[in-house]
Amino acid sequence: MKTQFAILLITLVLFQMFSQSDAILGEIWKGIKDILGKRGLNDLSDLDELFDGEISKADLDFLREIM
């Protein structure tokens, strides 16, 4: 009886671990597909507009004011 109970507990624990890891791996796979999909790559190109490599005079004045 003790052996059957131990096997049942071990089976339940392993099943719980499998079901949780399946959910985590599913979310990771979904994120990878979102990033590497056509729409995901198009969305990443929108981030290029956020960075402007040139520093204007107003930016320099603001940095001097902070220092």
From Swiss-Prot:
Sorted UniProt keywords: Amidation, Antimicrobial, Cleavage on pair of basic residues, Membrane, Secreted, Signal, Target cell membrane, Target membrane
Residues modified to Leucine amide: 36
Record carries keyword Membrane: yes
Tissue spec: Expressed by the venom gland.
Signal peptide: 1-23
Domain of life: Eukaryota
GO-annotated cellular components: extracellular region; membrane; other organism cell membrane
Propeptide segment residues: 40-67
Subcellular location: Secreted; Target cell membrane
Function of the protein: Amphipathic peptide with antimicrobial activity. Does not show antiviral activity.
Family according to the record: Belongs to the non-disulfide-bridged peptide (NDBP) superfamily. Short antimicrobial peptide (group 4) family.
Protein name stated in the entry: Peptide Hp1165
